[in-house]
């Protein structure tokens, strides 16, 4: 599946370069209008990142998320600063189908284990952002990549798989927002290690050949952000490529 993404600050569509708020590109389009274009092209899911909420949960763009959930024509998964059960329930109340949990899954495992038990694996996407170290280990970073952790991707996955964890969005930080190609080997390796996981690849997709390469290693889904917004290809072209790859 191909999942278009919108990153949101103050009601506007933006892109950050490698998670850096100082390296922000703002796009002259409305979130709802852009989402509806993706839906008309055939996309079924939309990935939303509330960057205001990520910085300060009190500034979550709740009304906008609810509007996108109700009017975009797609099912939505959303993340950005989900730290408490109240944060999580606010998203579900807004009509978001799946909550995307990142740093909290690394730093508050007991809380997130409770969420898997309460809501089930279909309602939660683990967002694990990794740096590949010199030994080839996928090391998880947290808090918008500002903090490195001592945990590998495997460490975090193994906490939650027995609790029904099914959806994992994995970003190679070195690729994000760069449009320099995707880390195909990373997704190939982890799909082979954890075939039961529905993997969402994110970061670096720059051309349709990148999609073919990911499909060839059985990656389940791909998040498309900058490549669509900058016109590298259209949603229609991407979907046709994915179906025929």
Swiss-Prot record:
Keywords assigned by UniProt, alphabetized: Amino-acid biosynthesis, Cytoplasm, Histidine biosynthesis, Isomerase
Pathway noted in the entry: Amino-acid biosynthesis; L-histidine biosynthesis; L-histidine from 5-phospho-alpha-D-ribose 1-diphosphate: step 4/9
InterPro entries recorded: Aldolase_TIM, His_biosynth, HisA_bact_arch, Isoase_HisA-like, Isoase_HisA-like_bact, RibuloseP-bd_barrel
The catalytic site is made up of 7 (proton acceptor), 129 (proton donor)
An example GO CC term for this entry is:
cytoplasm
Q: Does the keyword Disulfide bond apply?
A: no
Say yes or no: keyword Transport present. Answer: no
Where does it reside? Cytoplasm
CDD domains reported in the protein's UniProt record: HisA
Any one Pfam family match given in the protein's UniProt record, by short name: His_biosynth
Q: Name one GO molecular function term.
A: 1-(5-phosphoribosyl)-5-[(5-phosphoribosylamino)methylideneamino]imidazole-4-carboxamide isomerase activity
Name the protein family.
Belongs to the HisA/HisF family.
Q: What is this protein called in UniProt?
A: 1-(5-phosphoribosyl)-5-[(5-phosphoribosylamino)methylideneamino] imidazole-4-carboxamide isomerase
Which species? Idiomarina loihiensis (strain ATCC BAA-735 / DSM 15497 / L2-TR)
């Amino acid at each position: 599946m191909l999942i278009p993404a919108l990153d949101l600050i103050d009601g506007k569509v933006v892109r950050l370069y490698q998670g850096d708020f100082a390296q922000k590109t703002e796009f002259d389009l409305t979130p709802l209008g852009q989402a509806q274009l993706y839906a008309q092209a055939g996309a079924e899911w939309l990935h939303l990142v509330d960057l205001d909420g990520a910085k300060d949960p009190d500034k979550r763009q709740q009304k906008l998320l609810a509007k996108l959930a109700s009017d975009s024509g797609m099912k939505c998964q959303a993340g950005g600063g989900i730290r408490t059960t109240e944060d999580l329930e606010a998203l579900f109340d807004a009509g978001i189908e799946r909550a995307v949990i990142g740093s909290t899954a690394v730093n508050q495992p007991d809380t997130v284990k409770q969420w898997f038990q309460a809501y089930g694996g279909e309602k939660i996407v683990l967002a694990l952002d990794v740096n590949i170290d010199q030994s080839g280990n996928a090391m998880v970073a947290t808090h918008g990549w500002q903090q490195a952790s001592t945990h590998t991707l495997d460490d975090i996955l193994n906490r939650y798989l027995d609790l029904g964890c099914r959806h994992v969005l994995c970003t190679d930080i070195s690729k994000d927002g760069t449009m320099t190609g995707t880390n195909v080997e990373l997704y190939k390796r982890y799909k082979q290690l954890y075939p039961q996981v529905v993997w969402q690849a994110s970061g670096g997709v720059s051309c349709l050949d990148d999609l073919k390469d990911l499909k060839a290693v059985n990656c389940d889904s791909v998040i498309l952000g900058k490549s669509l917004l900058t016109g590298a290809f259209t949603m229609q072209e991407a979907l046709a490529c994915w179906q025929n790859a």
